[in-house]
Design a protein with these regions (language model features):
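Conserved catalytic cores of large enzyme domains
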Residues: 1-221
Length: 221
Protein backbone atom coordinates (compact mmCIF):
# COMPACT_ATOMS: atom_id res chain seq x y z
CA UNK A 1 0.00 0.00 0.00
CA UNK A 2 1.34 3.40 -0.99
CA UNK A 3 0.72 5.50 2.12
CA UNK A 4 0.65 8.73 0.12
CA UNK A 5 -2.98 9.42 -0.71
CA UNK A 6 -3.91 9.87 -4.37
CA UNK A 7 -6.83 12.05 -3.37
CA UNK A 8 -8.81 12.98 -0.31
CA UNK A 9 -12.28 14.20 0.59
CA UNK A 10 -14.22 15.03 3.72
CA UNK A 11 -15.25 11.42 4.40
CA UNK A 12 -12.20 9.44 3.30
CA UNK A 13 -8.99 9.13 1.30
CA UNK A 14 -7.95 7.10 -1.73
CA UNK A 15 -4.71 5.13 -1.96
CA UNK A 16 -2.94 3.11 -4.64
CA UNK A 17 -1.95 -0.43 -3.69
CA UNK A 18 -0.77 -3.67 -5.28
CA UNK A 19 -2.55 -7.02 -4.99
CA UNK A 20 -1.13 -10.14 -6.64
CA UNK A 21 0.95 -7.96 -8.93
CA UNK A 22 -1.99 -5.82 -10.03
CA UNK A 23 -2.63 -2.24 -8.98
CA UNK A 24 -5.82 -1.55 -7.05
CA UNK A 25 -7.48 1.48 -5.50
CA UNK A 26 -8.18 1.43 -1.77
CA UNK A 27 -10.72 3.90 -0.43
CA UNK A 28 -10.42 4.31 3.35
CA UNK A 29 -12.94 6.09 5.55
CA UNK A 30 -11.58 8.65 7.99
CA UNK A 31 -11.56 7.34 11.61
CA UNK A 32 -14.43 8.70 13.69
CA UNK A 33 -16.03 10.49 10.75
CA UNK A 34 -19.50 9.12 11.60
CA UNK A 35 -19.63 11.08 14.86
CA UNK A 36 -18.45 14.24 13.12
CA UNK A 37 -21.08 13.90 10.38
CA UNK A 38 -23.92 13.20 12.83
CA UNK A 39 -22.93 16.24 14.88
CA UNK A 40 -22.83 18.43 11.77
CA UNK A 41 -26.21 17.14 10.57
CA UNK A 42 -27.83 17.91 13.93
CA UNK A 43 -26.48 21.47 13.80
CA UNK A 44 -27.70 21.85 10.22
CA UNK A 45 -31.21 20.65 11.05
CA UNK A 46 -31.38 23.17 13.92
CA UNK A 47 -30.31 26.01 11.61
CA UNK A 48 -32.87 25.25 8.88
CA UNK A 49 -35.99 26.66 10.63
CA UNK A 50 -34.15 29.96 11.13
CA UNK A 51 -32.72 29.98 7.60
CA UNK A 52 -36.17 29.32 6.11
CA UNK A 53 -37.15 32.88 7.05
CA UNK A 54 -34.71 34.19 4.46
CA UNK A 55 -35.73 31.80 1.66
CA UNK A 56 -38.16 32.76 -1.10
CA UNK A 57 -41.63 31.63 0.09
CA UNK A 58 -42.13 29.83 -3.23
CA UNK A 59 -39.08 27.69 -2.52
CA UNK A 60 -39.60 26.89 1.16
CA UNK A 61 -41.78 23.85 0.49
CA UNK A 62 -38.84 22.07 -1.16
CA UNK A 63 -36.25 22.66 1.57
CA UNK A 64 -37.32 19.86 3.94
CA UNK A 65 -37.48 17.13 1.23
CA UNK A 66 -34.08 18.25 -0.05
CA UNK A 67 -32.60 18.05 3.44
CA UNK A 68 -34.10 14.61 4.05
CA UNK A 69 -32.55 13.41 0.80
CA UNK A 70 -29.22 14.98 1.79
CA UNK A 71 -29.21 13.23 5.19
CA UNK A 72 -30.06 9.91 3.56
CA UNK A 73 -27.27 10.37 1.01
CA UNK A 74 -24.74 11.19 3.74
CA UNK A 75 -25.62 8.01 5.65
CA UNK A 76 -25.23 5.95 2.47
CA UNK A 77 -21.85 7.51 1.74
CA UNK A 78 -20.64 6.50 5.20
CA UNK A 79 -21.22 2.81 4.43
CA UNK A 80 -18.85 1.53 1.73
CA UNK A 81 -20.81 -1.72 1.41
CA UNK A 82 -23.68 0.35 0.03
CA UNK A 83 -21.33 2.11 -2.37
CA UNK A 84 -20.08 -1.31 -3.48
CA UNK A 85 -23.65 -2.47 -4.12
CA UNK A 86 -24.45 0.74 -6.02
CA UNK A 87 -21.35 0.33 -8.18
CA UNK A 88 -22.16 -3.29 -9.02
CA UNK A 89 -25.76 -2.46 -9.94
CA UNK A 90 -24.83 0.42 -12.22
CA UNK A 91 -21.94 -1.57 -13.71
CA UNK A 92 -24.34 -4.39 -14.64
CA UNK A 93 -26.84 -1.91 -16.08
CA UNK A 94 -24.18 -0.28 -18.25
CA UNK A 95 -22.49 -3.48 -19.48
CA UNK A 96 -24.25 -3.37 -22.89
CA UNK A 97 -22.65 0.01 -23.66
CA UNK A 98 -19.08 -0.07 -24.96
CA UNK A 99 -18.37 3.64 -24.42
CA UNK A 100 -18.07 3.39 -20.63
CA UNK A 101 -16.23 1.21 -18.10
CA UNK A 102 -16.67 0.93 -14.34
CA UNK A 103 -14.06 -0.63 -11.99
CA UNK A 104 -14.59 -4.06 -10.45
CA UNK A 105 -14.84 -4.38 -6.67
CA UNK A 106 -12.49 -6.66 -4.72
CA UNK A 107 -15.05 -7.96 -2.22
CA UNK A 108 -12.56 -9.90 -0.11
CA UNK A 109 -10.68 -6.68 0.66
CA UNK A 110 -13.74 -4.47 1.20
CA UNK A 111 -15.75 -3.68 4.33
CA UNK A 112 -18.02 -0.95 5.65
CA UNK A 113 -14.93 1.22 6.16
CA UNK A 114 -12.72 0.12 3.25
CA UNK A 115 -13.50 -0.25 -0.44
CA UNK A 116 -10.95 -1.92 -2.73
CA UNK A 117 -11.44 -1.61 -6.48
CA UNK A 118 -9.76 -2.28 -9.78
CA UNK A 119 -7.40 0.52 -10.79
CA UNK A 120 -8.32 1.98 -14.18
CA UNK A 121 -6.13 4.99 -14.99
CA UNK A 122 -7.41 7.65 -17.34
CA UNK A 123 -7.20 11.23 -18.54
CA UNK A 124 -9.26 13.83 -16.70
CA UNK A 125 -12.11 15.16 -18.81
CA UNK A 126 -10.84 18.67 -18.06
CA UNK A 127 -7.27 17.94 -19.25
CA UNK A 128 -7.75 19.34 -22.75
CA UNK A 129 -4.07 19.17 -23.67
CA UNK A 130 -3.77 15.44 -22.90
CA UNK A 131 -7.07 14.69 -24.66
CA UNK A 132 -5.84 16.45 -27.78
CA UNK A 133 -2.44 14.72 -27.62
CA UNK A 134 -4.25 11.35 -27.62
CA UNK A 135 -6.38 12.43 -30.56
CA UNK A 136 -9.62 12.12 -28.58
CA UNK A 137 -12.58 13.85 -30.22
CA UNK A 138 -13.76 16.25 -27.52
CA UNK A 139 -17.08 16.91 -29.22
CA UNK A 140 -17.81 13.18 -29.32
CA UNK A 141 -16.65 12.94 -25.71
CA UNK A 142 -19.29 15.47 -24.64
CA UNK A 143 -21.93 13.49 -26.53
CA UNK A 144 -20.80 10.25 -24.87
CA UNK A 145 -20.91 11.78 -21.37
CA UNK A 146 -24.45 12.99 -21.99
CA UNK A 147 -25.51 9.63 -23.41
CA UNK A 148 -24.10 7.69 -20.47
CA UNK A 149 -25.71 9.84 -17.78
CA UNK A 150 -29.02 10.24 -19.58
CA UNK A 151 -29.12 6.47 -20.11
CA UNK A 152 -28.75 5.93 -16.37
CA UNK A 153 -31.29 8.63 -15.57
CA UNK A 154 -33.98 7.76 -18.10
CA UNK A 155 -33.58 4.01 -18.55
CA UNK A 156 -32.52 2.59 -15.19
CA UNK A 157 -33.84 2.93 -11.64
CA UNK A 158 -30.46 4.05 -10.23
CA UNK A 159 -27.94 6.60 -11.49
CA UNK A 160 -24.58 8.14 -10.61
CA UNK A 161 -25.49 11.42 -8.90
CA UNK A 162 -22.06 13.04 -8.53
CA UNK A 163 -20.78 13.60 -12.10
CA UNK A 164 -18.10 16.21 -11.41
CA UNK A 165 -14.80 16.13 -13.40
CA UNK A 166 -12.98 14.27 -10.63
CA UNK A 167 -15.30 11.30 -11.07
CA UNK A 168 -15.03 11.01 -14.86
CA UNK A 169 -11.89 10.07 -16.79
CA UNK A 170 -11.15 8.91 -20.32
CA UNK A 171 -9.10 5.95 -21.56
CA UNK A 172 -6.67 6.44 -24.43
CA UNK A 173 -9.26 5.08 -26.87
CA UNK A 174 -11.92 7.57 -25.74
CA UNK A 175 -13.85 5.19 -23.48
CA UNK A 176 -15.29 6.88 -20.39
CA UNK A 177 -14.35 5.73 -16.88
CA UNK A 178 -16.70 6.40 -13.98
CA UNK A 179 -15.49 6.57 -10.38
CA UNK A 180 -17.03 7.06 -6.92
CA UNK A 181 -20.52 5.65 -6.50
CA UNK A 182 -21.06 6.88 -2.96
CA UNK A 183 -23.68 9.37 -4.10
CA UNK A 184 -26.40 7.87 -6.27
CA UNK A 185 -29.97 8.75 -7.15
CA UNK A 186 -33.05 6.64 -7.65
CA UNK A 187 -36.01 7.42 -9.86
CA UNK A 188 -39.37 5.74 -10.38
CA UNK A 189 -41.09 5.10 -13.70
CA UNK A 190 -43.65 7.88 -13.25
CA UNK A 191 -40.99 10.54 -12.71
CA UNK A 192 -38.88 9.12 -15.53
CA UNK A 193 -41.76 9.51 -18.02
CA UNK A 194 -42.30 13.09 -16.87
CA UNK A 195 -38.60 13.84 -17.38
CA UNK A 196 -38.74 12.37 -20.89
CA UNK A 197 -41.65 14.70 -21.67
CA UNK A 198 -39.65 17.64 -20.35
CA UNK A 199 -36.59 16.81 -22.44
CA UNK A 200 -38.70 16.26 -25.56
CA UNK A 201 -40.31 19.65 -25.04
CA UNK A 202 -36.88 21.26 -24.74
CA UNK A 203 -35.47 19.44 -27.77
CA UNK A 204 -38.50 20.33 -29.89
CA UNK A 205 -38.38 23.94 -28.60
CA UNK A 206 -42.02 23.55 -27.66
CA UNK A 207 -42.79 26.00 -24.79
CA UNK A 208 -46.31 24.69 -23.96
CA UNK A 209 -45.10 21.09 -23.78
CA UNK A 210 -42.08 22.11 -21.70
CA UNK A 211 -44.18 24.14 -19.24
CA UNK A 212 -46.71 21.31 -18.90
CA UNK A 213 -43.90 18.84 -18.16
CA UNK A 214 -42.38 21.21 -15.60
CA UNK A 215 -45.79 21.54 -13.95
CA UNK A 216 -46.16 17.74 -13.82
CA UNK A 217 -42.78 17.53 -12.09
CA UNK A 218 -43.84 20.10 -9.51
CA UNK A 219 -41.23 22.58 -10.69
CA UNK A 220 -43.73 25.44 -10.90
CA UNK A 221 -45.45 24.98 -7.54
Amino acid sequence: LNTTALSGASLGQVYLATRNGQQVIVKVKRPGIEKVVEKDLKVLMKIIPFAMKFVDPNLRFSIIPIMKQFVESMHEELDYTKESDNLKTIKKNMEPYDNVVIPNVHDDYSTKNILTMEYIPGIKVTDIQSLDEKGIDRQQLVIDVHKVFFTMLLKHSIFHADPHPGNISVKDDGTLILYDFGMIGRINDETRIKLVRLYLGLIEKNPPRTVNAMDELGMLA
